[in-house]
Structures are given as structure tokens and as C-alpha cells.
Amino acid sequence: MSSYSAYSGSGIDQIDPFDAGDSNLWRKAEYLGRYLFAADFLRPYKPDLVADISCGLGYGALELCSAAGRVIGVDADRALMESARQRFKMPNLHFLNKDLNAGELSRDIAVASVSAVVSFETLEHLLDPARAAAQFSEILQPGGFFICSVPNVLSESGDSSGLPRNRSHKQWFNFASLSRLVQQNGMQVIYRLGQSWSRALFRREQQLSNARRISRKLCDEPVMHSGENMRWLSYVAAYPTVEDVDGSYSIIIVARKNDI
């Protein structure tokens, strides 16, 4: 996910992994790593149509084009969608300006027409995530895949009232609650993954820097922000795996819609 604005929520969070001017190296690697995984996972299935919900800047939808016949990116931010249309002009990539709180997704994307729905870091921003999950399931074909991520409650912190410190977060999820949400909408989790390596490396780098054992971080090296090196770092250090999933900031799942 690149934009929370698909649900007209507060806390818009735009990250472009290929923006060399953004110094958030590890965060960029994690964002890109999730899309690299989604494309790699889907490619052998040769999906006809993939929907990237809350596509934001559109770089993830572009990545998914390498695995799918067609990709549709969905976001409520009209300016973002227009920018993405101008930036990524490909015959099999389309962008839809859609606020899911204001209407049903199936009005623009046919019921049971989508091979896979991808939606990263979205559900935690919604007051009614079940409504979104129901819409995702509605447009999915039987046997279609749902690939999503949410922050792990173990990685979140609350204020003195017990509410999320990140005010754009309306929900806390653990694996059990996310699995229930998916199952209640006709899908079954088949894989749980995480990105613990990147988080561990980021923390280690911070510790060494604070202790003055190192004078520079990877994010201080301009060469690391090139497109080629961002992809390399995302694959090497931030590619979702099934190892040490509780050490990951985000819970990442692959679910499959039940056959009729």
C-alpha cells in the first residue's frame, strides 16, 4: 500500500521507493519488498486481472504488471490517480479514482472478475475493515488470492488511554484477528509472512550509530537510493518470508477465496 486515502482516512502516508530524495531507506525497502513478493507469488498463476487497492503513487501497480495480464490501481485521491496515469502509461495498467466509503467497488469492477486483490497497510486505518474485506471478496474469483499486510499489534504502542499513538490507525491486528476477518468473508489464509530481517538490521544500525560505533548509515549513501540498489536491498533484506514472523513490523498474509 502507498496511500491510506482510498478510504478517506487521515494519515496519508506516501512512500515512493524510487524517490532518491527520500532518506527512509529501510521503510522504502519494506514497501517495495511487499510488492516484489506479491508479483513473484502471482506470476506462476498467470492472473488475468489484479486489483491494487490503495495504490497511491502507483509504483506497486506497475510492479504487478510484470505478473498479470491487466492491473487496476484503486485510490480515492484524484490527484494521485491523475499523476499515476501520466507517469505510468502502459496498455495493461489502469487507475480508478474510487472512495470505497462512498460506494461499492463492484460498481466499477465486476463481481468475481479479479484473479487477485493486493492491499498493503490499509485495513488498520478503517473504522469498518470488515466492509472493505467483503468488497475485496466480492470482486475476487473463486480460488482468487488476497494478499495484504497490516501492522502487528506487537509492534504498535498505545497512549495513556490505550488508543493507538498513530492517530490514523483505527484498529489493532494480530494474526488471529486478521485471520478471522478473512475467514468471515469467504477466504482462508494459506501463508503468513513477515519482514523481520529489515527490522532487525534497521535496529542494529540504529544501535551502532547511537553508540558511535559507525559514523554513517546506509541511508546516508546516495548510491543506495538508486532504483537498482533499492530493488537489491528489498530482495536481500526486506523480502517477505515465513521466518520469524513475530519479529516483523507487519503481518503479511496470502489468502485464497473459497471455491463455490
Residue ranges and their predicted role:
Residues M1-A112, A116, F120, A130-A133, ...:
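Conserved N-terminal segment of class I S-adenosyl-L-methionine
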Residues E121-H125:
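A short His-aromatic
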Residues D128-P129, D159:
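Conserved catalytic-core motifs of eukaryotic protein kinase domains, centered on the activation segment
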Residues A130-P142:
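A short glycine-rich, Lys/Arg-flanked "PGG" loop and its adjoining helix->strand segment in the class I
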Residues C148-Q171, R180:
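Short, glycine-/aromatic-enriched active-site segment of Class I SAM-dependent methyltransferases
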Residues V153, W197-R199:
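Residue-level marker for beta-strand->alpha-helix junctions and adjacent short loops that shape enzyme
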Residues G158-G162, L201-Q207:
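Short aromatic-enriched loop/helix-cap "lid" or pocket-rim segments at secondary-structure transitions
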Residues L178-Q195:
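A SAM-dependent methyltransferase catalytic signature shared across enzymes that methylate proteins
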